[in-house]
Amino acid sequence: MQIEINRIEYEEMETRETMDFDAFKNFSNKIKWINLFFIITVVAMHCVREWETYYGRSDSAISSFLINLEVYAMACFFMMSGFWLFYEYEKYTYFEMIRKKIYSIFVPYILWGVLNLIIVQAVSLVETGQMKYSALDSIKSLLFIQIGTINFQPLNDPLWYLIRIMTYFIVAPVLYYLIKNKVVGAISLLVLAMASSSFGYYSFGRWLFVFCFGGYIGLHYKENIIKAANRPRGISLAFTLLIYIALCALYPYLNAHEMIKKDIDIIAIIIVLGIIILGKNPSIEMKHSNYAFMLYCAHMILMPFLVKIVGLILGNWVDEGVCQGIVVLVCGFIVAIIYLVLKKFAPGVYRVLAGGRNG
């Protein structure tokens, strides 16, 4: 009898562990799809900005819409980075975590920056007979430093996120002590929320609140958020993203209200959590998650060429916003080809450029 009871208890425990693993796997898959969506919005925004660099300000309503799609993307990236860090924070020692992040973040940051620099220098050499950047300026083009009057942005502009998130990982022990207690953590988040809007967009303090909020959930409410995200009932993830797109279309009108401008991080958190919780788990497994990372790192290398080509071919007879949408699609397609070719024929290069990530 006792043996039978033990067997039943063991089977129940095994079933519970399997369910927990499945719930985590489904949650992780959902986040990968959401991450890809927001990376595409970043690509769309940069496409419009690059187009305006060559052809002047775009008056197309589609262009404004493409820019507004990205408005909450960075909050999503920082929040989920904080969540994943503190979700498994006690699994590694500090130096193990830093070593892992150097390989997955800092090394790709340098390599993608150098690759972009080489291409820019080569194009300049062909077009003008001389390199665009001196040796010193080449080094500066790889940096992301903002201290007082010193202000260097990476030549591959989207990479600023990688180095900013790396600084948060470096000070993770301090952030951990800020949020490890629920009450003290909540007070710390309140202080950070009030202070974050006073910092510049790229500064250390600007995204600290959103990052720590994600970490706070990862420490104290990870089971709750994963359980909520795995609700059997809900609307499709695609439909929740369509709702987000509709909200972004209304953003210029909503942004006219001072409260929305001031509390943009709070609104971003609500929107991101809403997408995660309300959207049902996708039935399709994301098997190529590294594609999203490579798209984020590579799109600005391709963008100047694609904008010029599409502008020359279609710019005179197609709406600028439509042209920009075509650039985004072509960019995504080219990166997909590069991703698949590297993964199949140069797996070592692929893994280094992808930061050793699986997928």
Residue ranges: model-predicted function:
Residues 74-87, 166-176, 194, 199-228, ...:
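Specific transmembrane alpha-helix
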Residues 1-191, 316-359:
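Membrane-cytosol interface segments of multi-pass membrane proteins
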Residues 40-47, 189-202, 239-252, 298-305:
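Aromatic-anchored segments of alpha-helical transmembrane domains
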Residues 62-74, 150-164, 195-213, 247-272, ...:
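Interfacial loop-to-helix transition and helix-capping segments at the boundaries
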Residues 17, 22, 209-212, 219-294, ...:
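Alpha-helical transmembrane segments and terminal signal-anchor/GPI-anchor hydrophobic tails
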